[in-house]
């Protein structure tokens, strides 16, 4: 069966699938959803530059090509949408930006995973935070397995297939999720649009993405790109000590892993109020703006990356504090 559905900006969406009663309903239903997905990518990445795109039943799982994806799904609607969304996202990152898949596979697969899941959550009304947690879980599993290799490893040089897959897809996803955390949502959105419009059809490198993010945020990010992609250093922080200091409380944090990261520490009080304490790292030479989820936001002095411990004060006696959490959003 060949159906044609009109997508955004007059793009012709072709759907080729088997004449099988078990799948026809889902393949009909996915057509307007595909148009919504394309509209989402247009709005959040940049405009799709071609006049057509085809979704074809075939292959094994899903596979992207320029202006075409093969999808071997149909019995269930949500998996069909999920794979279509991921493969369609490749039209921007593999088809238009066209990063080198051998040297920087995470720039395509990680971005397609991140934006594919983000678009899916938008059109289906699902919770994108679940995708974030799943990607973190897969990355952490790899990081704790002893099989992880640096993300800058050539795609053909990974010792284990699992290491390639988790590094390209999950760790690539987490790279973008953490970038959004570091520079803030507005700067992140601006970064992606400027990156696409600046580097489409030019085969950008990781440093090109970094520079665009720095320009959009006013934050230096070489430390982030270096540690995350060229090493297997891990991010791990803990609360080391909490003590009374006259009418204030001193909170001492400890960096356990080798990789530095700006921190958001949420202090909840017994009276029901709460306050975020934002700790930039000195390598950033800047800071992000107060996020919408933080009702109260206090920026304290930078944490110099070389020091393992850091202490800051809270304007409350210890007995009035209910809880202290590092990065409570988990994002």
Residue ranges of model-derived segments:
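Generic, well-ordered alpha-helical scaffold segments in large soluble proteins
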Residues: 33-44, 74, 83, 87-91, ...
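Second-shell loop/turn segments in exported
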Residues: 19-29, 70, 101-102, 162-165, ...
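Loop/turn elements at helix/coil->beta-strand transitions in domains of secreted/extracellular proteins
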Residues: 10-12, 47-53, 89, 183-188, ...
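Acidic/His/Gly-enriched intrinsically disordered linker/tail segments
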Residues: 109-174, 178, 182, 199
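Beta-strand-rich binding/interaction modules
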Residues: 222, 235-327
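Amphipathic alpha-helical substructures
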Residues: 165-251, 275
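Zinc-dependent metallopeptidase catalytic helix centered on the HExxH motif
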Residues: 70-134
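Hydrophobic helix-coil surface modules that form long, contiguous segments used
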Residues: 1-85, 114-117
